[in-house]
Amino acid sequence: MSIRIIPQDELGSSEKRTADMIPPLLFPRLKNLYNRRAERLRELAENNPLGDYLRFAALIAHAQEVVLYDHPLEMDLTARIKEASAQGKPPLDIHVLPRDKHWQKLLMALIAELKPEMSGPALAVIENLEKASTQELEDMASALFASDFSSVSSDKAPFIWAALSLYWAQMANLIPGKARAEYGEQRQYCPVCGSMPVSSMVQIGTTQGLRYLHCNLCETEWHVVRVKCSNCEQSGKLHYWSLDDEQAAIKAESCDDCDTYLKILYQEKDPKIEAVADDLASLVLDARMEQEGYARSSINPFLFPGEGE
């Protein structure tokens, strides 16, 4: 199955009246998203060997919250949705959508917000980004979208991505359309922007017990059935790993068909669990999965592979 976004004027009457039994897509809910992430990162930093880095990530998340409301985006995406729907492509496809200068405006605003909080190497990094030319910044963004991580140092990537993520999340929040599940491929990528997930979440509330993958760029969540590999869609050779016990709130789902894994977070076991924060705070589990010979099928927006990784 794949997910396609349909323009409002192409929806059938039943689709306009009611949601699907299982919502295939949950557009980003930006109100307090970044503040909640920052709070969770600070909470997880206590008694965590990665505490300093989690607090650093919390500073970026808090800055995203401030910049989000200081620099709103106004954009009519109606034509873009129609074109993408006709082509069967993600409407905000990172590989083809022209980037507006708004994202660089967001980056400069993030740097201004973060400067008073930074020191040492981190301060030097954002000052270098502040001095970079428009083209240099665009080249770094293009490299990240192409997964050419050797072209962007791992200390610069989180700041560049934080601005790009804000821009894409703002656009995703403006999409005038509805998602429809259809037969197709590439469910492992975000149906809104084509980026990778950061982790998956088994939710509570109106989507109780359903698994949604969380986009590491536009913050959209999309449904993928449980007990199926989110990367290759096979189901015969799945295994579940945790550092605690079978009731752990965070597990890794590995697949022996493609030798990859993705973390599954369970809200029913910890209602405060957060897709980005808890993924970052559980890197010990990633180390274990690497020892077992599995490759990660996702990327955390605060932790990019460096050159040679």
From Swiss-Prot:
It is found in: Cytoplasm. One of its GO terms (cellular component) is cytosol. This is Protein FdhE. It comes from the Bacteria. Belongs to the FdhE family. Gene3D superfamilies: FdhE-like domain (3.90.1670.10). Keywords: Cytoplasm.
